[in-house]
Amino acid sequence: MVLLSKPTSEQYTYVRNNMPITFSSSIPLVDLSKPDAKTLIVKACEDFGFFKVINHGIPLDAISQLESEAFKFFSLPQTEKEKAGPANPFGYGNKRIGLNGDIGWIEYLLLTTNQDHNFSLYGEDIDKFRGLLKDYKCAMRNMACEILDLMAEGLKIQPKNVFSKLVMDKQSDCLFRVNHYPACPELAINGENLIGFGEHTDPQIISILRSNNTSGFQISLRDGSWISVPPDHSSFFINVGDSLQVMTNGRFKSVRHRVLANGIDPRLSMIYFCGPPLSEKIAPLPSLMKGKESLYKEFTWFEYKSSTYGSRLADNRLGNYERIAAT
């Protein structure tokens, strides 16, 4: 049973919602089995920093099994879940997102992909959950590399693995997160929606999101307006991260996104974050510069990751590394 306390206006952030939530039909769709996938990926990254993928090759029964085990974990007594925490940064956490005061209607597991055992609960069910997580993380890495290779092909740059090699590296800093947003009928307060996870961009190269069929995920368009992404439990959604924005010298833009809590149904999302090795230098790729001036100062992934720990979710974290304003 989930024991998050009732939301109060002092704890959480609300978003005014005078209109019923409508889902956008403009989300870019990429069929990974089609030859035009590489072209569509580049256009989606340029226009939205976000796209949906189908025909991804991940068995739906494996996804459903992991989702079921995740729900079992989050239904454990609070004292049991907290044995896997606190999230500092890895493990179980709830409400608090990061170290700088961000709060959300959420509980979560944050795991590193470089260790087989990185949360401390044990038991038959938990061992099954852990095994499914390991298999899923491997599948996500393979999908990420396929997408990143298609991206490089679409950009007409060599080598083809210029992005994916950073994910395949044994020292890669990839992370996996399972977010649970409990249902809470009390959320319909004065026509407002409760923030489950506040607006932010992901600092990594790309992130791969999959959720159950519960709504709540939104992305921000270039004009600053928010659109709701239709849930689809059989597909995956790709976010461009800050690191990829820098590597493409601003041609691709990291997508600002957030989650609004659902008052009726619980939402469960699983996100694979593709991070490079900590020592990797992040800078615009020479093959994409073509005589253009670099918009960003070079930094290591460790430097940028460290800076994110000292910031709030909504901060423009790339601002400290801009040479001239990215347009």
Curated annotation (Swiss-Prot):
Tissue expr: Predominantly expressed in roots, flowers, young fruits and seeds.
Catalytic class of the enzyme: oxidoreductase
Disruption-associated phenotype: Plants display to the slender phenotype, characterized by large amounts of GA20 that cannot be degraded, and is metabolized to excess GA1 on germination, producing plants with a characteristic slender or hyperelongated phenotype.
Pathway(s) it belongs to: Plant hormone biosynthesis; gibberellin biosynthesis
Keyword Endoplasmic reticulum in record: no
Positions that bind Fe cation: H200, D202, H257
EC id: 1.14.11.13
Cofactor list: Fe cation
Catalytic activity: gibberellin A1 + 2-oxoglutarate + O2 = gibberellin A8 + succinate + CO2
Residues at the catalytic site: R267
Domain Fe2OG dioxygenase: 171-276
A single GO BP: gibberellin biosynthetic process
Example GO molecular function: gibberellin 2-beta-dioxygenase activity
Pfam families the record matches: 2OG-FeII_Oxy, DIOX_N
Keyword presence, Iron: yes
Keyword vocabulary terms for this entry: Dioxygenase, Iron, Metal-binding, Oxidoreductase
Function: Catalyzes the 2-beta-hydroxylation of several biologically active gibberellins, leading to the homeostatic regulation of their endogenous level. Catabolism of gibberellins (GAs) plays a central role in plant development. Converts GA9/GA20 to GA51/GA29 and GA4/GA1 to GA34/GA8.
Family: Belongs to the iron/ascorbate-dependent oxidoreductase family. GA2OX subfamily.
Protein name per UniProt: Gibberellin 2-beta-dioxygenase 1
Species whose genome carries this gene: Pisum sativum
